[in-house]
Amino acid sequence: MSGLYKILRDSLTLLKEKPIIFLPKLFSALAGSLWFIGLVSGRISLLNLLLLFGPISIIGVLASLMVASMVKQEEISLKTSFYIALSKWRQSLLLIIAFSMIGFLISLPLSIGIYWYLITGSSIILTSAAIITISLMFAFVFASYFIPITILEEKNFRSSIKESLNVSKSRPKEVTLLTMFSFLLLGLTTASNEYLEALGYIGFLLGRLTSSIATTYIFVVSPKYYLEV
């Protein structure tokens, strides 16, 4: 536990000393928020939204890789971290495709549960479906916890996935605790965002930016732990 506490503390210290690390995730959150506002407001056509979905997804992955690269090499600039992340564009595209497919499969139980609940009114089915989806999500995060840094460390996509899974399996207790911490932090942030969203689109945007701060911290903890174990 003392080792994990040190990782969490050192990650906070790094962010205090180098706040520029927040910028990639803040930019990604801003881009994603504007895309979502365009979706719900109807101000952007469906075709344009579909065309923008790919670039928005790529920005999200590149932001994660930029954070990991600045943790790995604390002395590098934001510009250098961008070029490092961009050099992994093939792995980034494969990651988007793989995560999209896995995300769809993970959401299936809950989607079926909601559909069944609307037809039958069975809360048991809905609750069971939610538990299954959350469990699958937890297992997925556990297995992929180190993917940003392993993509930078490994030569190809397959080996980076395998390395992330192997590290998680070799230290199940610590990675489980870190995964639980990530869920808790994001859960608290999401809950607090409900108050901001009452302010409308501005509140939603502020909530997303707040969440990106918590997400940045999580994406600093992951490579920090990987590089020190």
Listing of model-derived features with the role each one plays in the protein:
Residues 1-229:
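Hydrophobic alpha-helical membrane segments
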